[in-house]
Amino acid sequence: MNKVILYCRPGFEKECAAEITEKATQHNAFGFARVKENSGYVVFECYQHEDAERLVKTLPFHELIFVRQMFVSGDLLRDLPPEDRITPIVGMLTGAIERAGDLRVEVPDTNESKELMKFCRKFTVPLRAALREHKILLGHEKADRPVLHVLFIAPGCCYVGYSYSNNNSPFYMGIPRLKFPSDAPSRSTLKLEEAFHVFVPADEWDERLGSGMYAVDLGACPGGWTYQLVKRSMMVYAVDNGPMAPSLMDTGQVMHHQADGFRFEPPRNNVYWLVCDMVEKPAKVTSLMSDWLIKGWCRETIFNLKLPMKKRYEEVSQNLALLRERLSENGIHAEVHAKHLYHDREEVTVHVRRFWSAVPGRRDER
């Protein structure tokens, strides 16, 4: 198995390919990316067979921006016989992996693949039974074991392989299944909800997304992101010259400041979260977020960077480098991650968590 299969949003294959090529080189793994426009996936073929498995195991998945999922695979299985599609798949996995903890039969996230989804659901049951019979898959799901992937890109054609549960997306097809809340002011609310799922571990939600916290939402109108904060019982400074949804104002948790988000300063020093989804040039937003973190006006921030039509990976990389450089120059210790979320379109979502050293009177971040 000398290939790494990477899922991405259709239309962002070039960005995904540029990213995996750069990251692989940094990990001394060399190869080339095969890209098919609007396919929703990229195939990175390694020159050395062992490098594909090593990348999937050691290249930190959470550091990848445009990649929704990744797994190591062999050659594409073509023209699977309708009377027995299972045997070639079992043969591909035999000797490559054993005692896996889960099976995902998936398709790329394209309109053309939707018809294949019905087949995948039906096919999963007999395939699972066969893999268990051959001891490739455990008799029960186990979260700390490798995950088997079968990606159908067309009827009778699939990539077969596996990923590691501690270095992959836990979601089917790499997509969190979120339901749009009927009382939310806009669909943009799903961006922030997905960001919480991706960037904040579930066992830390009570501590980092708890009730009673103070938050600031820059460019808040009509309140899609504010809604997520209010829903978690936070007090929110909503900053926007436009109107906020009356349903949010009626909660008593929202203080609406009709002001320019680039000039607003928090009226108190215990703001934990800063969120921002303003339509502005990425460099301008990055600079603003850096200022807030350097001044200690927030502890964590989630913000969106709107992408240009071309050189999108380069634009994101440049802004993240600028952000890290400014924080480092000012002695700020922080974690910085970015992801092209499922609910993002021509934008990337960035998360920064600042850590403080022990300071008298200040609760340390763990």
From Swiss-Prot:
Active site (UniProt): K306 (proton acceptor)
Location(s) in or outside the cell: Cytoplasm
Enzyme class per UniProt: transferase
EC number annotated for this UniProt entry: 2.1.1.186
Domain of life: Bacteria
Keyword Glycosyltransferase recorded: no
Reaction equations catalysed: cytidine(2498) in 23S rRNA + S-adenosyl-L-methionine = 2'-O-methylcytidine(2498) in 23S rRNA + S-adenosyl-L-homocysteine + H(+)
Entry GO CC: cytoplasm
Keywords: Cytoplasm, Methyltransferase, rRNA processing, S-adenosyl-L-methionine, Transferase
Keyword Nucleus included in the entry's annotation: no
Signal peptide: none
GO molecular function, one term: S-adenosylmethionine-dependent methyltransferase activity
One Pfam family linked to the record: RLMM_N
UniProt-annotated binding residues for S-adenosyl-L-methionine: S188, C221, P222, G223, G224, D240, D260, D277
Its job: Catalyzes the 2'-O-methylation at nucleotide C2498 in 23S rRNA.
Annotated family: Belongs to the class I-like SAM-binding methyltransferase superfamily. RNA methyltransferase RlmE family. RlmM subfamily.
Assembly with partners or alone: Monomer.
Protein name per the record: Ribosomal RNA large subunit methyltransferase M
Source lineage: Bacteria, Pseudomonadati, Pseudomonadota, Gammaproteobacteria, Enterobacterales
Gene, per the UniProt record: rlmM
